[in-house]
Design a protein with these regions (language model features):
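Surface-exposed interaction regions that form or flank ligand-binding interfaces
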Residues: 1-70, 77-83, 88-97, 103-213
Length: 213
C-alpha cells in the first residue's frame, strides 16, 4: 500500500487549492454576469424604490395594457415630471441616432457588430398611447431607458430633450438634476394624485407612495 509523506500531502493540498482558486477566478466573472442578467430588474427596482421613498414620489410598477401591447416597467410621479421608465440590459456598447429603427450593438468578447431595437421607438409609442388614453398633457412626461452600469452609450438626444438613457447607478442623481434644472412649477399635489389615479385606472395596478418627510 502506497502512503504519501507529509510533504507530499501538503503539496497535493496546495495544488488543489491553487487549481480551485484559478478556476474560481476564471468562473466568478462569468457567474456574476449570469446572476446579474437574471436579477437586473430587481436591482433596478431597488434603486427606483429608494428614489421614491426618499423623495416622497408616487410610483406605479408594471403598467400593462395588453390590447395595445403597452408595457412600462415603472412610472414615477415626481415634483415636476412624470417619468416613464423601461428596463433594458446590454452586455457591451450601443450607439445610434434617435430616429434609427435599430442601434448598433457591440457585445463584449464578440467581434461581430450586431443590432438591437431602438428602445426609444417603442417607449415613444407607449407614451403616445398613455397620453391619449389618460388625457394628460404630453409636456408633463419624461421618457427613460434604464440600463446596467457597465454598458457604454453613444446615442444622441431627441429634439424635445425629454428622452434619457440612464444607468442604474446614475438614476437618482440624474432624476434630481432633471427636476432641479426644469424651469417649470411643481405639480399641484391634488393634480398629481389625480394624474396617478387616471393612469392607474387604465392599468389594473395600484399606486405606491413614498414615505412622508
Amino acid at each position: 500500500m502506497f502512503l504519501f509523506t507529509d510533504r507530499q500531502v501538503i503539496y497535493i493540498v496546495l495544488a488543489c487549492v491553487c487549481c480551485l482558486s484559478i478556476l474560481f477566478l476564471f468562473l466568478f466573472p462569468l457567474l456574476k454576469k449570469v446572476i446579474y442578467r437574471r436579477s437586473f430588474k430587481k436591482r433596478y427596482y431597488s434603486v427606483i424604490n429608494k428614489l421614491v421613498l426618499d423623495e416622497d414620489y408616487l410610483l406605479i410598477n408594471s403598467f400593462i395594457i395588453k390590447g395595445l401591447n403597452i408595457k412600462i416597467d415603472h412610472i414615477i410621479f415626481a415634483n415636476k415630471f412624470i417619468y416613464l421608465v423601461k428596463d433594458e440590459y446590454y452586455e457591451g456598447a450601443i450607439e445610434g441616432k434617435i430616429k434609427d429603427n435599430k442601434f448598433i450593438y457591440y457585445p463584449y468578447k464578440n467581434r461581430d457588430v450586431l443590432t438591437v431595437p431602438n428602445p426609444y421607438i417603442k417607449l415613444k409609442e407607449d407614451f403616445d398611447n398613455i397620453v391619449r388614453l389618460a388625457g394628460i398633457d404630453a409636456n408633463f412626461f419624461q421618457l427613460v431607458t434604464l440600463i446596467n452600469n457597465d454598458v457604454l452609450i453613444n446615442v444622441e438626444k431627441n429634439k424635445q430633450n425629454n428622452y434619457h438613457i440612464i444607468s442604474r447607478g446614475n438614476l437618482i442623481n440624474e432624476i434630481k438634476e432633471i427636476e432641479n434644472a426644469a424651469k417649470v412649477h411643481d405639480f399641484n399635489q391634488d393634480a398629481l394624485v389625480k394624474a396617478a389615479k387616471d393612469i392607474a385606472r387604465i392599468n389594473e395596478r395600484g399606486v405606491k407612495r413614498g414615505r412622508r418627510k
